[in-house]
Amino acid sequence: MLVAVGLNQKGATVADREVLALPSEELLDALTAFQALDGVDEVAIVSTCYRVEIFAAARCPAAAELSLRHALEARAGRSLPLFELQGEEAFRHLVRVASSLESAILGEPQILGQVKDAFHRAAEAGAAGKELASVLSRALAAAKRVRTETAVGRAGVSWGNAAAALASKVLGPLAGRRVAVIGAGEMARLTAQHMRDERASVVVLNRTLANAEALAAEVGGEARPLDALEQELLRADVVVSAAPAAPAALAPAVMQRILHARRKRIVMVDLAVPRAIPAETGALPDVYLCDVDDLDRVMKAAMAERAQAAQHAERIADEEVQKFARAEAERRAAPLIQEMRSRASAIAREEVERTLRRLGEDPELAKRLDAMAGSIVSKILHAPSTRLRQAVCDGGANDPLVAAAVQIFDLSAAPAARGDAA
């Protein structure tokens, strides 16, 4: 059975998380130690800035949970706000993690790769085998559905993302477009990063060239002094003003002359409050001026889209958990159903052989009687098998129907109850 034990940003502080942080050079030793714990068969560790979570295939889930808790708290040297999950709930958590539904920023793309890498490294170390490989495959399939069927990974909510979205509405894709960012503060940095992520060519202009150079180095762009702005306006497709006061080059008269020379559209984004770019500049032909109110509307729409996407993603997670539960029920019920079918088939075969001894050897008749007996066994046991699978899914060995089947058919095999050995 799948077991998950760990902590994350939702219930643990940075201080709690950092005492469990696993540097890559310690991962192999940790995997070996955790796999050797009581009740644990296979193990993988997802360790990021926001979480340290252990996923284990356990022959005895209760023992595995206890031993993993003790091991983690021993590593920390104190008690920790650890969560403990089993079976379907452990799988649900893994799906939510891989789909970024548990992330600090909904939709962030890094976690899927981190989960995949964690399980692959565990497999390479010999700590994870077939059971965790199957769990990972199902979780990744669920995460892929969330990414492709919802807007969870597409609806960004930030000033920079909103600025990029507005510019894209006017100019189309920003890849290869030239974006001039005026200023080198936090708003300038965030917007420059988003423009870079859109594969735009970013140039940073600032009164203090050293600050422009630092930001340009961070985003892989160019740095120019602010007095080069008028020259830059002849080339830029997008201008982002993240400075408290607009340079003289953005005045209506100057911009009119620049527009006459450049003869193409330009998007201007004013991030200042009070607004720094004159409204008269925004009224010029081929100028598309956006201010913080425009950005706010885009952000609110993105937030609404993201909330709707999250609801859709939760429904997908529910569907995938149900698939997982059915597969687990099939696996747990298989020994019971197999024994029941084997006994019935053996009885049918004995009766066929007894009939053939009376009727004499006839290969064609034997073939037909075997087929008939097999068909009878399958049809008689189809409904009981279906009911038993559902009973195992609902309650495992504790379900009255399962107990009754074991008694009625005198079976030795029985599925594990939830929380017992898998």
Curated annotation (Swiss-Prot):
UniProt-listed Pfam families: GlutR_dimer, GlutR_N, Shikimate_DH
Pathway: Porphyrin-containing compound metabolism; protoporphyrin-IX biosynthesis; 5-aminolevulinate from L-glutamyl-tRNA(Glu): step 1/2
Residues annotated as binding NADP(+): 183-188
One annotated GO biological process: protoporphyrinogen IX biosynthetic process from glutamate
The UniProt record lists the keyword NADP: yes
Keywords in alphabetical order: NADP, Oxidoreductase, Porphyrin biosynthesis
Site-annotated residues for Important for activity: 93
Binding sites annotated in the UniProt record for substrate: 48-51, 103, 108-110, 114
Active site: 49 (nucleophile)
InterPro entries the UniProt entry points to: 4pyrrol_synth_GluRdtase, 4pyrrol_synth_GluRdtase_dimer, 4pyrrol_synth_GluRdtase_N, GluRdtase_CS, GluRdtase_dimer_dom_sf, GluRdtase_N_sf, NAD(P)-bd_dom_sf, Shikm_DH/Glu-tRNA_Rdtase
Catalytic activity: (S)-4-amino-5-oxopentanoate + tRNA(Glu) + NADP(+) = L-glutamyl-tRNA(Glu) + NADPH + H(+)
Gene Ontology molecular function terms on file: glutamyl-tRNA reductase activity; NADP binding
EC number: 1.2.1.70
Coiled coil ranges: none
Miscellaneous remark of the record: During catalysis, the active site Cys acts as a nucleophile attacking the alpha-carbonyl group of tRNA-bound glutamate with the formation of a thioester intermediate between enzyme and glutamate, and the concomitant release of tRNA(Glu). The thioester intermediate is finally reduced by direct hydride transfer from NADPH, to form the product GSA.
Family (UniProt): Belongs to the glutamyl-tRNA reductase family.
Domain characteristics, as noted in the entry: Possesses an unusual extended V-shaped dimeric structure with each monomer consisting of three distinct domains arranged along a curved 'spinal' alpha-helix. The N-terminal catalytic domain specifically recognizes the glutamate moiety of the substrate. The second domain is the NADPH-binding domain, and the third C-terminal domain is responsible for dimerization.
PANTHER family xrefs: GLUTAMYL-TRNA REDUCTASE (PTHR43013:SF1)
Oligomer and partners: Homodimer.
Function: Catalyzes the NADPH-dependent reduction of glutamyl-tRNA(Glu) to glutamate 1-semialdehyde (GSA).
Record's protein name: Glutamyl-tRNA reductase 1
